[in-house]
Amino acid sequence: MKSLFKKKLCLASLSAVIFALSACGAKTTGPAPEVAIDLGRSSLYTPEELNIAVLLIKDKFVTFAGCELHSIRYAGDDANNEKNLEWLNSLREVRSNIPPEDVGKQYVQVAEFLSNFHSPVEDGDYAWNQDMEYTDYQWWLGRLDDGRWEIVSWGY
């Protein structure tokens, strides 16, 4: 009988600890908000090609601790020009994390995206101003001749 009581007491204590730990610092925010995507119109890229670029941006954005992404939009075909292509290729030349098989390759196309997001409400060790809406945050992607996109630069 004592053994059964001890098991129940231990189980109840463990449940209370788990509940308490799960509530510590936890915030019930509900489901993640929808991110509005605007691919606009492009005579250079298909919607599928632009969506692949958007997925790369979303994957990178996940590293923006505490930030909430609201929207991403394609900035238009005008960004794909010689000046921007030279700029992105110059940035690629100084990168140290290029796979050996891609060393020496150049971007053949450029795409710019703009995003809106909100920085963390809580004060923390973040690179962002607290509780602020960031608008038209730039994402610059270069495209290699095999069709792969790479995020080259982001920010203002």
Each predicted region: which residue ranges?
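Short beta-strand edge/turn micro-motifs at domain boundaries
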Residues: 134-156
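Flexible low-complexity loop/turn motifs enriched in small/helix-breaking residues
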Residues: 24-124, 131-133
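Sec-dependent N-terminal signal peptides of Gram-positive bacterial secreted proteins and lipoproteins
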Residues: 3-27
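Residues in flexible loops and secondary-structure boundaries
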Residues: 9-13, 17, 80-82, 121, ...
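Functionally constrained cores in energy, signaling, and assembly domains
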Residues: 8, 15, 115, 138, ...
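Catalytic micro-motifs at enzyme active sites that drive phosphoryl/nucleotidyl and oxygen chemistry
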Residues: 126-128, 139
